[in-house]
């Protein structure tokens, strides 16, 4: 079973507890790292542990050092898209979308960054309607992009 790691922007209580109540193993940022730990430091450690990173509305694609941390460490990074919604609503959508998320993870090799969207209309979350999952970037896409300039590739020191 996949284990998940929640970034600090998902909070310590509501989001992880909702996932746990629904049978998902969850590790919370605050239990493993200092609150001010830079993302580029904890991302590789979380990836080494095999945990899937969950974050909310985080634009890691536009922060080169964080993007490199994901791609160079073979992290699996799910960005939960929700705008300005409560963590509990993101958690409900995650649980509703769990089957699609698990399928996506099984079908995509690490590293990757994917977005988990809420259903349309958003009221579907409360009715149990699943959202969707979309790949935003994988390793090959990163290597081809100018965002990888200056960072080592696999097999390079």
PLM regions and their residue ranges:
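Charged phosphate-binding loop/patch that engages nucleotide di/tri-phosphates or the phosphate backbone
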Residues: 103-157
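Short acidic active-site motifs
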Residues: 14, 37-42
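Short beta->alpha connector loops at strand-helix junctions that form conserved
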Residues: 30, 56-57, 80-82
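Alpha-helical segments flanking ligand/cofactor-binding loops in enzyme cores
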Residues: 43-44, 68
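Conserved BB-loop
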Residues: 25-39
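N-terminal intrinsically disordered, cationic/polar leader segments
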Residues: 2-3, 12-13, 17-21, 25-27, ...
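Mid-chain, well-packed structural core segment of small domains
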Residues: 61-100
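Acidic, metal-binding active-site segment of PIN/NYN-like and related structure-specific nucleases
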Residues: 39, 50-66
């Amino acid at each position: 079973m996949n284990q998940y790691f929640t970034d600090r922007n998902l909070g310590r209580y509501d989001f992880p507890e909702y996932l746990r109540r629904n049978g998902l193993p969850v590790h919370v940022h605050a239990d493993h790292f200092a609150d001010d730990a830079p993302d580029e430091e904890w991302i590789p450690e979380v990836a080494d542990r095999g945990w899937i990173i969950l974050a909310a509305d985080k634009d890691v694609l536009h922060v080169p050092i964080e993007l490199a941390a994901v791609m160079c460490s073979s992290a699996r990074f799910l960005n939960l898209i929700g705008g300005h919604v409560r963590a509990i609503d993101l958690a409900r959508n995650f649980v509703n979308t769990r089957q699609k998320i698990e399928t996506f993870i099984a079908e995509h090799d690490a590293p990757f960054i994917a977005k988990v969207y809420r259903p349309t209309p958003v009221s579907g979350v409360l009715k149990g309607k699943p959202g969707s999952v979309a790949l935003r970037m994988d390793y090959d896409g990163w290597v081809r992009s100018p965002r990888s300039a200056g960072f080592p590739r696999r097999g390079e020191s």
